[in-house]
Structures are given as C-alpha cells and as structure tokens.
Amino acid sequence: VAQVIALVGTGLSTIALALLAYNMAGSEAGRVLGIALACKMIAYVFFAPIIGGVIHRLSRKSFMITMDILRAFIVLLMPFVSEIWHIYLLIFLLNFFSAGFKPVFQAVIPDILEDDEQYGKALAYSRIAYDLENILSPTLAGIGLLFFSYTGLFVFNSVAFLISAVIILFTILPKSKHVERSGNVLNEISYGMKAYFKTPRLRSLLVLYIGIALASSMIIVNTVIYVKDYLGETDSSLALLFAFSGLGSMLMAFLYPKLAKIMNDKTITQLGIIILSISLFYMSIEPSLIFALSAWFLVGIGLSLSQIPSGKIVNMSANPKDRTAYFTAQFSLTHLCWLIGYLAAGELVLLFGFGFTAIFFGCIVVFCYLYSVLFWPDEDSQNILLHKHKNIVHTHTHDHDPHHEHHNHPIETTHEHEHHHPEVVHKHPFQIDLHHQNWPKH
C-alpha cells in the first residue's frame, strides 16, 4: 500500500516535471528532461552501493521512514523553481534519498515472502502497482490540471511520501539476517558490485537492461517532444500515451504468474527484449497518434516482461544474508544504464530526429538479446553447481550452517572465532559469497 501511494504521487510529479521542462525550455524540453533524469540516475548509481554496504548496520524501518520524509520535503520545493539548474539540483537530491529507499524496499520483499511462487506473484503485483501509477497518474493529473496548475501535483506527491512513511511506521518487518562479511566499510560497499559481476546470469541481465533502459528512455524523455512537435497534439494526448504504455505493462504483469509456470525467467526476460526491439522499430513509422498508441502499448508489454523476473533472478543469485548488497548493486548498475539512455535519448532525437533514434536504439536492443543468448548459462534452472573449496583457516562472524558445522563453540547464535574449512568438492545452489568467491569453471 505504501508503495502504491508513493508511486502515484511520483507519477503526478513526473507529468508535472515534463510540463515544467516544456514551459521553461520549449522545444529543448527533451534535452532538459534528459539532463534532469540523468541527475536522478547519478544519484542512484553512486549512492545506492553505499547503502548496500552499510544498511545491515541500521534499522531498515527507521531508514525507509527517514528517506520518505526527506523526499516529501524536497518535492515541496519544486513549485518554487525559477531556473533550469534548480530542476537539476532538486531532482538530484530527491533521488539521492530514493536511492536509499528503493533497493532496501526491494530486498525486504523476499524476506517477507520466502516461497518462490509467492515472491514471483509479489513481483508481479509490484509491477502492477507501478503500472497502475502509469495509468492512474495521468488520469489524476488530467483531472487535477482542470482545477489548478501543474505545480499542485508536486504538493500531492509530497503528501504521498508522508503517507507512505506513516504506513511503514505501523508495518512489522522481519529482522534482517546476520551478514557474514570481512573487511572494512569500503570493502563492504564494493562487495555487492564484485559479487554481481562474478555471476554470469547477472552480467547477462545487466546487458539486457541496456536495451530496457534505451526503450524506456525513448518513452520517458521523448514522449512530450513526440506529442507536441511531431503530432501537434495536446497535454491530454501526452497522458494518453503514458496510459497506453502502462496498460500494456499491467496486462503482462497480470499474466506473469501463469507464464512463470510454463516458461523460465530467462526466457520470459528475453521475450520482453524481443518485443522492445520490435516496438522501437515500429516507432520509426511516420508519426501518427494511432501508430504511437500501439507502439507505446508494445513498449509497455516488453518492459513488463523483461523486468518482472529480474527480482527473482537477483534473489536466486544471492545468499539471503547478502541480499541487500546484491539488490543495491542491481539498482545502481541498471540505473547507470538509464543514465546513459536518458542522455542519449534527449541528445540523439534533438540532433538526428525521432525516427533515426528509434531505429538505432532498436538495433542495440537486438545486440543485447544476442549477448544474452550466447552468455547466459543454461544451468540456471536449478542453480546447483559442482564446485571445490580449498583448505582454509579464517576468522569471521557466522552462524552454524552447512558450511559451519563445527561444534567446538557452544553458542548457537551468531558468533566469531577462528575455524577451519577442509578441502571439499560438493554441489548445492551456488551464490557468490564469503565462502564462494569465484564462479565455477566447467
């Protein structure tokens, strides 16, 4: 519920930001919006890994509530913007705090829902919430704009963040698992990134996110330019295109639990990428509102199919104790893709036009798909790999588990002492962690 309320509020601000950029920059609104969203991505890319490295030392509930309150304050400042650089600064600060909230929220979900099927449904429902925002926000924005200026939408977003904070305050969250990690704070901050890049399926997923980001950027950055300058339509058409994209995405979110029973997550993700490439080529057709509605609908379908499984893919790749570090790495790296996408979408359309940019992005998406076909391992359906552990003696905090079955220490809770791991060859669901620092080579 907190997510839905915050998302609807954010959706109102997204539309208000597009209108604010157009009012201040005119035909260069795409460039202004692209740079503003790049500021958002910079905050995501550089702040999220820091949170991933230290969040296990903090209360997750208190942290998320604090982030919501700070976001509410920043959004309230939006109506007072008078210079373009004000937009850039406030967008950076707003998303500096969002970069703390979102990956922690994502990592909490599998702690609450440990069953894989239920977690998959939760991801689908989360996507539905996101898509309801795409559908409801333009509608609510359109109604709101009949009675007040777009600056009022920022006020509604601020209230939404405060409501989200109150809901989280009264929500019971499970205690986070103890983290088995050695080293200083810098090592902890970089841990998630290192583990992410050592996992083949996650490297392939990241390449696919390049394609996802490019398709998404065309929608987010250039819809206002496409509607105003290419179609000559009004603000209502802008809201309509966003709504059609949300409808396509929500349709696939409803169907995902059924698809997951007959297709694996790798196949579903790749199918989404194929649809995104088709939709980008489709966008290059002569500008028409009818063509645009169908193209935006296809993009929504592709974005939903390609992104919903990512949570399960990251979750299966991570030791539960390291889950937040993996999710923050995923959050940071994928938003780096969006950073590049936003800048490229704004500049290329301005320099070469909408049609050329759509075709160029479509070709890159095809390349991303081919990479995943070649380098995403097939054994991921089970994630059980044969591997060898070297003989080692070390010290770190740990619990008694299959890798720590010694009984020379009486404490059954988390404890720390020097202990020995003999050389062993075995197989089990494999994740990069303190005791599995490199992916097995076959």
Task: Pin down the residues of each PLM region.
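Short extramembrane helix-to-coil loop segments that connect adjacent transmembrane helices in Major
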Residues: 22-31, 226-237
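C-terminal ends and interior cores of transmembrane alpha-helices
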Residues: 69-83, 274-287
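Substrate-agnostic recognition of the 12-TM MFS/MFS-like secondary transporter fold
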Residues: 1-14, 36-55, 59-74, 86-146, ...
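Helix-loop junctions on the cytosolic side of multi-pass membrane transporters
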Residues: 107, 111-112, 154-184, 374-384
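Cytoplasmic membrane-interface "Motif A"-like loop-to-helix N-cap segments
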Residues: 57-68, 261-273
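Transmembrane alpha-helix termini and helix-breaking/packing motifs in multi-pass membrane transporters
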Residues: 16-25, 78-80, 136-156, 229-230, ...
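C-terminal transmembrane helical hairpin of 12-TM major facilitator-type secondary transporters
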Residues: 266-307
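Juxtamembrane intracellular "pre-TM" segments in multi-pass secondary transporters
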Residues: 174-207
